Amino acid sequence: GSNRERSQIIMRLSAEGLKDRAKWEEAGYALPKFDREKVTEATKENPFWIHFGAGNIFRAFQANVVQNLLNDGILDRGLIVAEGFDYEIVEKMNHPHDDYTILVTLKADGNIEKTVVGSVVESLTVNTENASDFARLKEIFAKDSLQMVTFTITEKGYSLVNGKGELLPDVEADFVSGPEAPKSYIGKVAALLYARYQAGEKPVAMVSMDNCSHNGDKLYAAINTFAEKWEENKLTDAGFRAYVNCKEKVTFPW
């Protein structure tokens, strides 16, 4: 009925909808305790952490951890998230809700904890056909402030071959077309890392957070393969592969 519709309008998950904090708190939601506009501005200007993979693991863990650190005043900047498989997560979930999400946690005692998570302040598609998103990703990767690039893209996200050990068609095409407009996921990540190399060989930690053995090695092997092929095919500066392999500059911890 009209009452229910009215309450849904009032409880809209967006920057505008969250202005009525009392309404949300009465309904049992914990809200961000930090100045989100200020955090958004600082993060976009000087991003320090970008995460690839905008799924549930990211929303429940990385985003929630950063929210707690922002709430406690330990951090002054939030997260940027990029999605490379399912662009609709960004276009139909993140953007309409101003990058806010709701985390519902079932506690051991049976209580349900509801939290509005506001630590993600920008979301982008990892899509070379979306020129503005990919240009923005390159801009983020060129920033001095960037320290950490993290991933939850599933184990298969790092694979360059199919079940038979044959190169995936997109990967094969990317090896010969170079870093301008790659189609494969790791090709796009390698192209972004190349943008960081071109901006002055700036240091960065490339951190796989997927639950697989030696996850950092898998990420390194995939990116290094691109660096090798692109150098072989004279599609990048000669120093890019050395940059990927220089542990003072780029690390792949596991």
Locations of the language-model features?
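Short, Lys/Arg-enriched N-terminal segments with co-localized hydrophobic residues
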Residues: 1-10
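Non-transmembrane, aqueous-exposed alpha-helical and coiled segments at domain scale
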Residues: 9-254
